[in-house]
């Protein structure tokens, strides 16, 4: 997902979700 919101917790940056 290119426009994946932080709420979706993108697999590209799982650490960014926290």
Curated annotation (Swiss-Prot):
The keyword Secreted applies. Keywords: Antimicrobial, Hypotensive agent, Secreted. One of its GO terms (cellular component) is extracellular region. The keyword Nucleotide-binding does not apply. Expressed by the venom gland. It is found in: Secreted. Its main location: secreted. One of its GO terms (biological process) is regulation of blood pressure. Belongs to the non-disulfide-bridged peptide (NDBP) superfamily. Long chain multifunctional peptide (group 2) family. Antimicrobial peptide. May also inhibit angiotensin-converting enzyme (ACE) and potentiate bradykinin (BK). This is Probable bradykinin-potentiating peptide. It comes from Tityus metuendus (Scorpion).
